[in-house]
Every structure is written in C-alpha cells, then in structure tokens.
Amino acid sequence: MKTFTAKPETVSRDWYVVDAEGKTLGRIATEIASRLRGKHKPEYTPHVDTGDYIIVINAEKVTVTGNKAAGKMYYSHSGFPGGIKEINFEKLQAHKPEMIIEKAVKGMLPKGPLGRAMFRKLKVYAGAEHNHAAQQPQVLDI
C-alpha cells in the first residue's frame, strides 16, 4: 500500500467561525494554527496546504492568565539603529486587538511560503461582525 499524498487541487476547504470572547489566548491560538495547517483532516500532508479558513470574532475580548495582561510585551523594530518599540498586552488590546491573535497564530505556523499561505486563510475581527457571510461559515467550538 502506498502512502497517500494530498494534491493541492483536490483539497476541500471549509470556513469556520471562532468566537474568542472569554477564551485564553494560547489555547485558542493552538487550535486555530492546527486547523489552518489541516492537521485535523485524515488527508493531512505536511508539504501541502490542506487547512481550512478560520474567521475569529471578538478578538478584543480574548484573555490571558496571571499578570501577562500588564507584563506581556510585544516588540517591533523599524530596521534603524535604536528603532525598537515595545507595547504591552493591555495597550495593544486597546489599540489593535486583531494583532494579538494574528501574532500568536503566526508564530505557531511553519516559516516560509507554505506558512504564509496558511496564514492568509486567517481572518481576525475585533468585534462580533464579519463580512464573510457569503461563505456560510460553520461555528467552531474551542
């Protein structure tokens, strides 16, 4: 018996909606990353993008445990000397709540062209509304 390898043109992709309200950041991010990779499917192939589309709503209401709300820092660099910037979780949640989930999930995906293709299937929204109703997404409980 030969090992099954999924072909990119035969992969079927579904759309799912995840409500992040009251959920812990790491626990929701690991499940989203796994679904984006397609590891929940029997036809999973590591070098083929077999994952589904994920829509995350209520990103502004995601939680972290312990003192991470005040202590967890996010860093960015402009590329110029002395150009490092830092912002903590609370301020980033008030300013750009989508970026918190995007950054957590992106770090869990493979690096390179395949990981970037997987990341493009993630849609994150701060509020409860999204504009993907035409895709008829299913609700995913995490």
Swiss-Prot record:
Gene3D superfamilies: Ribosomal protein L13. One of its GO terms (cellular component) is cytosolic large ribosomal subunit. The keyword Transferase does not apply. One of its GO terms (molecular function) is structural constituent of ribosome. Keywords: Ribonucleoprotein, Ribosomal protein. InterPro entries: Ribosomal_uL13, Ribosomal_uL13_bac-type, Ribosomal_uL13_CS, Ribosomal_uL13_sf. GO terms for biological process: negative regulation of translation; translation. Part of the 50S ribosomal subunit. Belongs to the universal ribosomal protein uL13 family. This protein is one of the early assembly proteins of the 50S ribosomal subunit, although it is not seen to bind rRNA by itself. It is important during the early stages of 50S assembly. HAMAP family: Ribosomal_uL13 (MF_01366). This is Large ribosomal subunit protein uL13. It comes from Shewanella amazonensis (strain ATCC BAA-1098 / SB2B). The lineage of its organism: Bacteria, Pseudomonadati, Pseudomonadota, Gammaproteobacteria, Alteromonadales. The gene is rplM.
